[in-house]
Regions:
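Bacterial N-terminal signal peptides
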Residues: 1-9
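Conserved, mostly hydrophobic/aromatic
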Residues: 30, 65, 99, 174, ...
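Aromatic-lined carbohydrate-binding/catalytic grooves of carbohydrate-active enzymes
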Residues: 48, 52-151
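Aromatic-lined carbohydrate-recognition surfaces of secreted/lumenal glycan-active proteins
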Residues: 104-120, 166-183
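Glycan-recognition surfaces
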Residues: 126-129, 173-274
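Catalytic cores of secreted or luminal carbohydrate-active enzymes
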Residues: 257-306
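Carbohydrate-binding surface patches
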Residues: 262-265, 270-272, 308-351
Length: 400
């Protein structure tokens, strides 16, 4: 029994060492599922890697190109997983080499069950074998789903794959996609780099879609389910609010709000649109340097809601160097006026042990979308369009 315990402990330490430096800020990249589902092949992945460089996504910080479900073929006589020979005739190793040649990283998908959500071979019973295969191919990121896994213990199943990745000899970011069913935030910090907190995102701002076999949540519904979870997030271990739907049909105001919310909440930023054909407005939204800087702030603290006044909510995120990000969110489909008297506010966060009394400290602010500037010596007044945000970065004295 002692030997088993020591073995598990040593493997856990090994994983920590190999994972060192991965996801020190929320991971940024692209995933095939939201836009393409099972309609994927190696040409799409290559063209997406090209577009990631050509459109400035790589320069903005997006680095992972992740293949989701349906890349699988069958297992060979020795049980080794093979890619679909029609979709990926060159093989995954050649694809990884191509992506790496662009200065990017390649991610892949599997499932804790015997079959994936798309009905392809999962990793159940083949965890160590699959991890070795991924390492041999040059994989940098593993998204691990939870279909066909009803009889399994989630923590044990994900820990097995964590240990398999550690033993493979190649560092890989490990993304748990368990949909929040078994409260992964309570145990996954020592298992993976991020964990999904909700069912899948659906391409809408405020809706819930249940086609009968699954549930899809809009942006606001996912935000609401983050209540109480911020204490579990931090460098190397993040609450994952699912992939982005920016550029997939919501309004520009909704797209800006969507990215802002994910950045404030320190969720991974995984693009879910077609990078090859996105509009210039979508590209500008997704590469906004100020919003991305909030997402990637090295302090790694998730935002807290500090005000809820009807459809208007205010979220605050402490940043490195004594700065703050502040987001005013209009949840309504009607415009909302903001009249914010800074001097009546004391901004306090028990988690980061930070507090600002605006009577004593004047902070400058910059609007991360409009580029307007001001300071907290005067009231903030603005009109928020439906489903929009005002996102500010506060800079000033570090005295708290």
């Amino acid at each position: 029994m002692l030997g088993i315990f020591l073995g598990a402990a040593l493997c856990g330490n090994s994983w920590a060492q190999k994972a060192e430096g991965l996801a020190s800020t929320p991971q940024m990249g692209w995933n095939s599922w939201n836009k393409f589902a099972c309609n994927i092949d190696e040409r799409l992945i290559r063209e997406t890697a090209d577009a990631m460089v050509e459109t400035g996504m790589k320069d903005a910080g997006y680095q992972y190109v992740n293949i989701d479900d349906c890349w699988h073929g069958e297992r060979d006589a020795d049980g080794n997983i093979q890619p679909d020979p029609k979709r990926f005739p060159s093989g995954i190793k050649a694809l990884a080499d191509y992506v790496h040649g662009k200065g990017l990283k390649l991610g892949i998908y599997s499932d804790a069950g015997a079959t994936t959500c798309g009905g392809h071979p999962g990793s159940r019973g083949h965890e160590y074998q699959d991890a070795r295969t991924y390492a041999r191919w040059g994989i940098d990121y593993v998204k691990y789903d939870w279909c066909d896994a009803q009889s399994l213990n989630a923590e044990a199943a994900y820990t097995t794959m964590r240990d398999a990745i550690a033993k493979s000899g190649r560092p890989m970011l490990f993304s748990l996609c368990e949909w929040g069913i078994n409260k992964p935030w309570e145990w996954a910090g020592q298992v993976g780099h991020s964990w999904r907190t909700t069912p899948d995102i659906y391409n809408c701002f405020d809706c819930e879609f249940s086609p009968g076999f699954s549930t899809g949540l809009g942006v606001l519904r996912i935000l609401d389910r983050q209540a109480g979870l911020r204490k579990f997030a931090g460098p190397g271990h993040w609450n994952d609010m699912d992939m982005l739907e920016v550029g997939n049909g919501m309004s520009e105001d909704e797209d800006r709000a969507h990215l802002s919310i994910w950045a404030m909440m320190a969720s991974p930023l995984i693009l879910g649109n077609d990078l090859r054909s996105m509009s210039e407005s979508t590209r500008r939204i997704l590469t906004n340097p100020g919003v991305i800087a909030v997402s990637q702030d090295k302090l790694g603290v998730q935002a807290l809601r500090v005000l809820a006044d009807g459809p208007l909510e205010v979220y605050a995120k402490p940043l490195d160097g004594g700065e703050w990000a502040l987001m005013f969110l209009n949840r309504s489909n009607q415009a909302v006026d903001v009249h914010h008297d800074w001097k009546k506010q004391i901004l306090t966060d028990d988690l980061s042990k930070r507090s600002v009394d605006f009577k004593q400290n004047v902070y400058g602010w910059s609007d991360l979308w409009s580029k307007k500037t001001g300071d907290t010596s005067t009231k903030l007044q603005a009109r928020l369009a439906p489903h929009s945000v005002l996102m500010l970065r506060l800079t000033g004295p570090a005295k708290t």
